[in-house]
Amino acid sequence: RCLRREGYVFSTESLISFYTSHGWTLKTAEVYRLSDNICTLLVCAVAEECDRFMKNGRGSTLRMRSAIESLRRLPELEINEVFSALCPTETLFMKVKGFADGDDATRDVYREALIRCARRRREDECVLLSRMTEQCGDGRLLALIAPHSHLPAVMYYLLTTVLAVAVSAFSFLMWGWLSLFAVLPVFEAVYSLGDFVFSRIVKTTPPLRLSPEKLPCERETLVVITTLLFGGDKDDGIFERLEEFWLRNEHKGLRFGILGDFCDCREPKLDGDDVIAKNAAEHIKRLNAEYGDNFALFLRRRTKNSSGIYGGRERKRGAVVDLIKALRGGEKPETFICPFDMSKISYLLTLDSDTELPIDGAIELLSAAMHPENMPVLKDGRVVSGYGIFQPAVRTRLADSTRTYHALFGSRSSGVYERASYDRYQTLLGSGVFCGKGLIDIEL
């Protein structure tokens, strides 16, 4: 009626005004269906006018033009304004910090979880949400509305195990003891089949994020590239990459640095070590002079390992541990340049020398790590809720995935995109496996 009254001229303001003038409200699911309903009505209006033209030539050109123009403007519907004006649950949601400070995708996760929970319990959305917000207080609302279920994980491992055992038993009956050579390939094939099936059955929920403008700047983040330094042109490329990362992720709460080691050798120090350290320090000083005091250098001394070789202690793992200790007032590396206050660093983002950090990639990780639902909760020294480490999805570039046969096997050819969206452990169990590249909460 609103569209007919306005001559099929559509706008968010006229729609809200029509509903509020009649004292009508909408449920969450009805708001999501609103765009499709309006689209259907406008298409029917165009069809009616075309039918009138065909029958007696008395169709309204103005109404048809208005309906077509409204169809073109339909994507401009401000869904958040509609929610705020017409949906009673939005007022309750805005009292929850994780929802109020979240981005649009995060708000959709909350709303869709409420829709499913209300349908499952057969309760009114407002009554259910009001009770849930009182129960959670300042805690995790989403954990109450949509608690993580371990049923998909149980079904996955049960079905894959039964299928693998059945195939192995059949192979043993057919080929006897020779089938033992096929046990590992069979299990790998079954797990791959299980990943393929469950990636289409189990819905992957996007991580909850804060809006970028809601990120607290008092908790700073240090982005470091862990690498070996050799001097010369090889090191120049690493510092150029560090500069690119800064330009792609310029933010007042981000700091950048190099976490380096010297190459392995049989002596604690080589003649060229001082030149390598001096070259690295000059690069850091140049970046600080050009972009402000936002760059640091952490270059460790060699230590002797059990094999009698001198090198960085425990390589990358040891480098990260030593850096966290230094950030918290511990022993500093041999070559140390840090013009900013290290005590303000709350997060450490570790990257490899061959890792790409996309535009605003660090900010996206931070927005997920700082969301109230994702903040880690400790019990007896272990994280029992939330996350202490955030690891971004690893995407293999198509050019790299087909460069060698080994890379083709590792990227699984056509699975380049699926592997970035579905993860067996994270999707089914709610936790992942850290591979060394990610955001670490160093305050734990």
Features from the language model and the residues they span:
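Alpha-helical bilayer-embedded segments of polytopic membrane proteins, i.e.
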Residues: 149-195, 392-393
